[in-house]
C-alpha cells in the first residue's frame, strides 16, 4: 500500500448538494426549504426555542450564586518550586514569597495570594511565606527541614 493509493471507504462521504440551482436539479426554486414562513428565510432558529415545549433553561431550577467577595488564590505545587530552585531561578536561602515566585516565573498572575499544594517532592530546606498551604504541603516542607508561614490573603495583597 502506498500513500497515493489510499482511498476513502465506499459510501463514507457524500457529495455536497448545491441547492437553488434550477428546477431540473431537483433542489431548485425553494432549495428544499418548503414554501414561505420563518424557516424558509435566512437567520432562522430562535435561540433556546424548542417548538413550544418548555425549554431546558426554564425546566431546570436556578441554583447557586457567585460570591463576589470570595478569595481566588494562585496555586503552585511544591514540585514546581523545587524545579525552580534546581534551575537556579529561586534562591532557597532567601524567603520565598509571592513576589519571588512571580519574579522567578513560577506563577504568572498573582490573584488574591498564593496557595501552595503538596504535588511533587521538595528536597531543599526552604522558608516560604504565602497566603495558604494544604496539609500535605506543610508536612512535606517541614519534613525537608523548612518552615512555612501562612499569611492572610489581605496581608499578602498589601505587600
From Swiss-Prot:
GO MF: rRNA binding; structural constituent of ribosome
Entry keyword Ribosomal protein: yes
Domain of life from the UniProt record: Bacteria
Bias type Basic and acidic residues, positions: 1-18
Transmembrane portions of the chain: none
Residue ranges of the region described as Disordered: 1-39
One Gene Ontology term, aspect cellular component: cytosolic large ribosomal subunit
Pfam families noted in UniProt: Ribosomal_L27A (PF00828)
Composition skew (Gly residues), residue ranges: 21-35
Any Gene Ontology biological process: translation
UniProt keyword terms in alphabetical order: Ribonucleoprotein, Ribosomal protein, RNA-binding, rRNA-binding
PROSITE patterns in UniProt: RIBOSOMAL_L15 (PS00475)
Function: Binds to the 23S rRNA.
Protein family: Belongs to the universal ribosomal protein uL15 family.
Listed HAMAP family: Ribosomal_uL15 (MF_01341)
Description of how the protein assembles with itself and partners: Part of the 50S ribosomal subunit.
Protein name: Large ribosomal subunit protein uL15
Amino acid at each position: 500500500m502506498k500513500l497515493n493509493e489510499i482511498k476513502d471507504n465506499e459510501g463514507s462521504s457524500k457529495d455536497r448538494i448545491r441547492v437553488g440551482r434550477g428546477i431540473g436539479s431537483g433542489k431548485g426554486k425553494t432549495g428544499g426549504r418548503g414554501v414561505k414562513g420563518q424557516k424558509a428565510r435566512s437567520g432562522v432558529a430562535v435561540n433556546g426555542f424548542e417548538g413550544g415545549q418548555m425549554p431546558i433553561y426554564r425546566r431546570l431550577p436556578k441554583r447557586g450564586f457567585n460570591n463576589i467577595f470570595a478569595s481566588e488564590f494562585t496555586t503552585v505545587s511544591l514540585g514546581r518550586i523545587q524545579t525552580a530552585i534546581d534551575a537556579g531561578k529561586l534562591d532557597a536561602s532567601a524567603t520565598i514569597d509571592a513576589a519571588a515566585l512571580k519574579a522567578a516565573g513560577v506563577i504568572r498572575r498573582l490573584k488574591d495570594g498564593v496557595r501552595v499544594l503538596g504535588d511533587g517532592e521538595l528536597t531543599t530546606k526552604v522558608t516560604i511565606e504565602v497566603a495558604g498551604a494544604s496539609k500535605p504541603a506543610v508536612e512535606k516542607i517541614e519534613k525537608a527541614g523548612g518552615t512555612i508561614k501562612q499569611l492572610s490573603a489581605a496581608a499578602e495583597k498589601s505587600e
